Amino acid sequence: MRIDRFEFAFTFNDVILLPGKTEIEPSNVDLTTRIGNIALSIPILSSPMDTVTEEEMSIAMARMGGLGILHRNCSVEEQVNMAKAVKRAESFIIRDVITVSPEDSVEEARRLMREHGISGLPVIVGRKLVGIVTRRDVYFAENGSLLVKDIMTKDPITVGPEITPQEARKIMARYKIEKLPVVSESGELIGLVTAKDVFYRESHPFATRDEEGRLRVGAAISPFDIDRAKTLAPYVDVLVTDVAHFHNENVISATKRIIDEVGVPVIAGNIGTYEAAEEAITRLDIIGLRVGIGSGSICTTGEVTGVAAPTLYAVASASEAVRKYSKDVAVIADGGIRGPGEAAKAFAMGADAVMLGYALAGTKEAPGSTMMIGGKMYKIYRGMGSPSARSKRFAMDRYSKPSKDIAEGIEGLVPYRGDVTTVVDRFVAGLKAAFGYVGAANISEMKSKARVALISHSGMSEIAPHDVKPLEKISD
């Protein structure tokens, strides 16, 4: 290696975005983006870490217009159940409807409602709808030995599969009902529309939804676990290969097999160089690249091994490869993004979306319980290469196959931050402000208009708050 061939692997604190002439107000900035066929209203994905993303985080992210990626440090059954929970959280037309027959007992109907947390059951004979029974019906049926046919509402109001949310709302209001069975022309039950789902759809107009109106969700997988990928396939919208170093022949070959055999869109990662991006996008039919190695706040890969690819450098390298080959592959910046300033720099360098771990850890929706220390509330946040995460064994191969006997992550505490909606709203507001300063109306313009400058250590110190003691530190 000759010293004159050294590359400058710059990171977020090495550069600054310069302000430009603008007519753009932050409130008018459009942050929509696409990852394959998945349209996002906000360009944010939650990281597949077991202290960041399970079903609660995924539901919240999708409702805000982002996307949650479920971690894989669990059994495949647990991961599937998380994905199912996201899909069930909202669905304009519920397809997998739980039903009863007229000859079932009221007690059986009551048990099903209690077990599944639902308030009504269509009544069918064969596949034909003959009635509907509600929680109110079973509540007032004092004799549990009565049959469903004795208390059900016969000939309920029904709609066809072409019904729209607006039409459903009007019908429910007119007839003062909360459930609308969806039937075919021959009267066979197709699905169910509930008032709750109509409400959620109207309350979250920018949510990330699939063709059936359900919330979208992704799941992390090992490229070597094709059985898990196949099991998850019916319940997720995208699979994300979850390895620290994707630019490995065994990993690439295993990922190609998943793409060929599973039939679900794939985001590949993590990568850190132009060459890795080039090989991934020319050899694999992927929709996105997860970019950055060793930059996460709880990742110690660079420290332990001396090998890393800082996220901003990696984004610039990967986006150059995507441009060269004119591929419709999204570049997703992953690691070291603590706030909207880092995200803005990533978009300027060519990112299409950002993946957040630390920025979302500690929120109410992040997995884990809160703890009180010194009068303040905290939550656990750990890297997937930390000893405690590796002890669960499901994600051990993220850092090699077979697993290396070294830890490449740490575990720590982060302050409890409350609802993730509030955290993301602030993040998005800061991001829009950055776009406004640059003069970019959208992500595409941010890539083309942003002027990036190197900044000295003194310059970085100057633009940070200085020469005063923050009030919160005095109160500490």
UniProtKB/Swiss-Prot annotation:
Gene3D superfamilies: Aldolase class I. The keyword Cell cycle does not apply. Mycophenolic acid (MPA) is a non-competitive inhibitor that prevents formation of the closed enzyme conformation by binding to the same site as the amobile flap. In contrast, mizoribine monophosphate (MZP) is a competitive inhibitor that induces the closed conformation. MPA is a potent inhibitor of mammalian IMPDHs but a poor inhibitor of the bacterial enzymes. MZP is a more potent inhibitor of bacterial IMPDH. Keywords: CBS domain, GMP biosynthesis, Metal-binding, NAD, Oxidoreductase, Potassium, Purine biosynthesis, Repeat. Its EC number is 1.1.1.205. SUPFAM superfamilies: CBS-domain pair (SSF54631), Inosine monophosphate dehydrogenase (IMPDH) (SSF51412). GO terms for molecular function: IMP dehydrogenase activity; metal ion binding. K(+) binds at G294, G296, C299, E462. It comes from the Archaea. Its cofactor is K(+). The active site is at C299 (thioimidate intermediate), R398 (proton acceptor). The keyword Metal-binding applies. It catalyses: IMP + NAD(+) + H2O = XMP + NADH + H(+). Pathway: Purine metabolism; XMP biosynthesis via de novo pathway; XMP from IMP: step 1/1. NAD(+) binds at D242, G292, I293, G294. IMP binds at S297, D334, G335, G336, G357, Y358, Y381, R382, G383, M384, G385, E408. GO terms for biological process: GMP biosynthetic process; GTP biosynthetic process. Residues 93-151, 152-211 form the CBS domain. Belongs to the IMPDH/GMPR family. Catalyzes the conversion of inosine 5'-phosphate (IMP) to xanthosine 5'-phosphate (XMP), the first committed and rate-limiting step in the de novo synthesis of guanine nucleotides, and therefore plays an important role in the regulation of cell growth. Homotetramer. This is Inosine-5'-monophosphate dehydrogenase. It comes from Korarchaeum cryptofilum (strain OPF8).
